[in-house]
C-alpha cells in the first residue's frame, strides 16, 4: 500500500481496528485504550514515513466502534488530543455510531444528530481536521459556530 501512496501521492487514512469486522468486538481488551491506539497509529505512520510516504499524506483515525466498547469510544473522543499531538491530520468518524445510541438512550441511528454534532465539535476542539458525518449541513453550521466562538469573531 505504501508504494501506491508514494506513486500516486494519494492520502492514506490509518484507522485503528483489531481483528476483522466479524470478530472485532471480541477484541476490546485494553489496559489503556487511548495510549494503545495512539501508539499503534504512531507506529503505522512511522512505517509509512520510512517507506517514503510524505507526512502530509497520512491521516489518523482512532476507529470509533471498531474493536472498542462504549466507554473506550468515549475515552478516545475525550482524549483525542493524544492523536492530534502527533502532527498528522486526524479524522473522527462517529456519525450515528452505536456509542451515540447508547449515550442517547437507545435511539435509532437516524435520530442521533445531536450526538453526532457533539462528537464533531469535540473533535474540532481537540484539533482534528476532519469529521465524517451523514448530516453535513447541520455539522458544518455547528462547526462554523464553534470556530467563531474560539476566534471571538464572526470573521
Question: For each predicted feature, which ranges?
Answer:
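Active-site metal-binding loops of divalent metal-dependent hydrolases
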Residues: 64
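Active-site-adjacent loop and "lid" segments of alpha/beta metabolic enzymes
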Residues: 1-51, 67-155
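Short acidic capping loops at alpha-helix termini that bridge into adjacent secondary structure
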Residues: 55-57
Amino acid at each position: 500500500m505504501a508504494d501506491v501512496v508514494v506513486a500516486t501521492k494519494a492520502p492514506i487514512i490509518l484507522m485503528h481496528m483489531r481483528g476483522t469486522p466479524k470478530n472485532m468486538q471480541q477484541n476490546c481488551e485494553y489496559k489503556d485504550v487511548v495510549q494503545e491506539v495512539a501508539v499503534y497509529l504512531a507506529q503505522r505512520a512511522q512505517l509509512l514515513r520510512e517507506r517514503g510516504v510524505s507526512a502530509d499524506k497520512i491521516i489518523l483515525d482512532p476507529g470509533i466502534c471498531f474493536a472498542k466498547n462504549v466507554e473506550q469510544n468515549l475515552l478516545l473522543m475525550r482524549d483525542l488530543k493524544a492523536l492530534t499531538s502527533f502532527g498528522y491530520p486526524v479524522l473522527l468518524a462517529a456519525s450515528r455510531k452505536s456509542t451515540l445510541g447508547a449515550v442517547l438512550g437507545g435511539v435509532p441511528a437516524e435520530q442521533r444528530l445531536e450526538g453526532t454534532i457533539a462528537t464533531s465539535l469535540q473533535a474540532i476542539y481537540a484539533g482534528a481536521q476532519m469529521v465524517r458525518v451523514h448530516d453535513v449541513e447541520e455539522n458544518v453550521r455547528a462547526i462554523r459556530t464553534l470556530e467563531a466562538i474560539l476566534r471571538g469573531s464572526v470573521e
